[in-house]
Amino acid sequence: PLEGLLAADEVAVMGQSCGGVEALDISPDPLVKTSVIWNSGIHIRDTPDSRIKINKDKLKALHAPIAYFIGGPGDIAYANATDDYARIDRVPVMMANLPLGHMGNYNLPMGGPFAPVGVAWLDWRLKGDQKAKAVFVGPHCGLCGDPAWTIQSKRLDELR
């Protein structure tokens, strides 16, 4: 029933918490045009004992723009996400922090403040929507002017 309705050349992957790690694991797939990581990042660890097999080397294989939406320092995944951000240097990356903790505000109607920024990222990256781009890029970027959010980015200005 979905034949002809899906754009197989415009694929995004996203996930929250452990699902974000799974999204990062599949992000190097050549079909992926963008990744969105919610309250997550690849675990920081010094030993190979973890049951989670993905490690920071996976970040070297990224080929498409990636966005991290994190719940601030109170988010259990904050350190993992900020470490990922620091390591990513080959692709455009954006990190947006809203200090709501690990579960953010997903329980609010319509997903709370995280939902519209996620939609804007997808509209920009998959549809080329310039109004959506302005949420993240430019001298008066929408999130940049919102004191509730802390925004960091690298190489976003390279994107159309």
Functional labels for PLM-detected ranges:
Residues 22-26:
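Hydrolases whose catalytic domains are alpha/beta-hydrolase-1, hotdog thioesterase
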Residues 1-21:
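Gly/Ser-rich "nucleophile elbow"/oxyanion-hole loop immediately N-terminal to the catalytic nucleophile
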Residues 13, 64-68, 117, 128:
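Extracytoplasmic low-complexity repetitive segments enriched in small/polar residues
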Residues 33-108:
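The feature captures the conserved acid-bearing segment of alpha/beta-hydrolase catalytic domains
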Residues 91, 100-103, 108-160:
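Alpha/beta-hydrolase-fold serine-hydrolase catalytic core, especially in secreted/extracellular enzymes
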Residues 11, 95, 122:
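Divalent metal-coordination and catalytic microenvironments
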Residues 16, 28, 59, 108-115:
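Solvent-exposed, acidic/flexible segments
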Residues 30, 39, 125-126:
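Sec/Tat-exported extracytoplasmic proteins
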